[in-house]
């Protein structure tokens, strides 16, 4: 009987040949895997110590905020951080921390823009804001709602009866806001009224106006300013909506300033036609 020869260690494709020819590569791979596992082990060992470092934990009292307007009531910083669940210790090494802080402050109804968020070490943060400015109070059943120049509803609970009286009162509005404070009212009529109130600005107080209302018998939608004595100034269209031949908002405001200086101004004035 013919005896079968034992398998040769040098047979091509054999395990020993593979190991022999790949020995250098396998050695390098083992070193890389060991280094990676060692890195993860070190990270797991020392990461808790990094987070335990008080200089790496950001607390609310180390967050400074600039740009908060004087008409903003309450503690804007505390409310913004609390509502975003960021009122605990925050790891300074979180790469998304600046964005999280920006989102938290940007969600506050008084905040128009988050201008800048800067982190510092030891753990501190600087946040710069631009706040919305109230320009009018819209009369609704049960009270007044503040709006800015773009018709965004503001937190009316921050106003007293006395402070609310310093702003134009928009009357005759039939709608209600479509969202919460910090959202646009959602009615073009309210947005127009807010634009008129913003354009009139300081002249409102100088002229002693009481109400801003829709013109009752105008051929096209326009606005009237009414003072405490019942005298009316027809302002006309909101800024940007002027008809053909109607003066622009700058010309109207110039006329308003002249009327403010005239103690004997008439019962009715019309800013949509030349004086």
Predicted regions and their residues:
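Membrane-proximal extracytoplasmic alpha-helices
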Residues: 70-80
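Charged, solvent-exposed interaction patches on well-folded alpha/beta domains
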Residues: 1-64, 82-275
């Amino acid at each position: 009987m013919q005896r079968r020869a034992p398998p040769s260690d040098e047979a091509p494709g054999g395990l020993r040949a593979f190991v022999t020819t790949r020995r250098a590569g396998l050695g390098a791979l083992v070193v890389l895997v060991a280094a990676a596992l060692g890195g993860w082990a070190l990270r797991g060992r020392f990461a808790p110590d990094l987070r335990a470092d008080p200089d790496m934990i950001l607390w609310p009292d180390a967050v400074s905020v600039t740009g908060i307007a004087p008409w903003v009531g309450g503690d804007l910083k505390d409310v913004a951080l609390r509502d975003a669940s960021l009122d605990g210790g925050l790891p300074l090494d979180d790469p998304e921390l600046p964005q999280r802080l920006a989102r938290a402050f940007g969600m506050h109804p008084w905040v128009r823009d988050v201008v800048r968020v800067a982190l510092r070490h030891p753990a501190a943060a600087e946040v710069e804001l631009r706040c919305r400015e109230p320009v009018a109070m819209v009369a609704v059943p049960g009270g007044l709602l503040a709006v800015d120049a773009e018709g965004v509803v503001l937190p009316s609970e921050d106003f007293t009866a006395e402070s609310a009286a310093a702003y134009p009162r928009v009357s005759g509005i039939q709608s209600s806001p479509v969202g919460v404070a910090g959202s646009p009212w959602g009615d073009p009529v309210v947005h127009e009224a807010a634009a008129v109130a913003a354009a009139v600005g300081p002249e409102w107080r100088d002229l002693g106006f009481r109400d801003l209302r829709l013109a009752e018998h105008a051929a096209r939608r326009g606005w009237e300013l009414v003072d405490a004595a019942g005298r009316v100034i027809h302002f006309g269209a909101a800024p940007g909506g002027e008809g053909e031949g109607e003066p622009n908002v700058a010309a109207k405001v110039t006329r308003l300033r002249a009327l403010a200086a005239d103690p004997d101004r008439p019962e009715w004035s019309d800013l949509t036609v030349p004086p």
